[in-house]
């Protein structure tokens, strides 16, 4: 590891993030505005950070995700809320921040060793068709600052409301 930030772009951000999450052993902390699951049974050739997060939770990694309540209020139940529910069923903890101010940050911290900060949401379009930009940091001070912010946002956030099984 190095203390020099590395620039990530549309060609490499999803692969780097997915590899880091696939290797996670202890924690994955995520801030995101939008989380939209890749439909179950649909695979595409690009790396899939959402599936990596879901799989990390299934293998016992402590996954915590904070998303904007604004998304929950404005998008149909088939997108953000259903994606969050899938993560919860996999073993992740998901919380929503109140709509004001809107959480628009996108960051992923893996095992308190790697911090990904960028423009990409957890969505297929961010992987397949958007122009995204970000940075990978492994500086202990930056990671500690992020984790302090994450803890304060986690304390302010509310648990994701769970849908009734069967969608009722």
Give the residues covered by each predicted segment:
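Short, flexible loop segments at the rims of nucleotide/cofactor-binding pockets, characterized by
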Residues: 4-10, 40-42, 93-94
């Amino acid at each position: 590891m190095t203390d020099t930030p590395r620039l990530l772009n549309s060609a490499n951000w999803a692969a780097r993030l997915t590899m880091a999450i696939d290797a996670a052993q202890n924690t994955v902390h995520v801030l995101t505005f939008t989380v939209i699951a890749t439909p179950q049974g649909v695979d595409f050739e690009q790396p899939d950070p959402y599936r990596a997060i879901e799989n990390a939770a299934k293998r016992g990694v402590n996954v915590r995700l904070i998303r904007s309540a604004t998304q929950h209020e404005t998008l149909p139940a088939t997108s953000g809320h259903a994606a969050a529910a899938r993560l919860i069923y996999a073993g992740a903890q998901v919380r929503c921040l109140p709509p004001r101010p809107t959480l628009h940050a996108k960051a992923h911290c893996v095992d308190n060793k790697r911090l990904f900060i960028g423009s990409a949401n957890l969505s297929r379009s961010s992987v397949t068709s958007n122009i995204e930009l970000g940075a990978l940091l492994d500086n202990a001070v930056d990671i500690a600052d992020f984790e302090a912010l994450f803890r304060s946002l986690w304390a302010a956030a509310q648990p994701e409301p769970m849908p009734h099984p069967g969608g009722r």
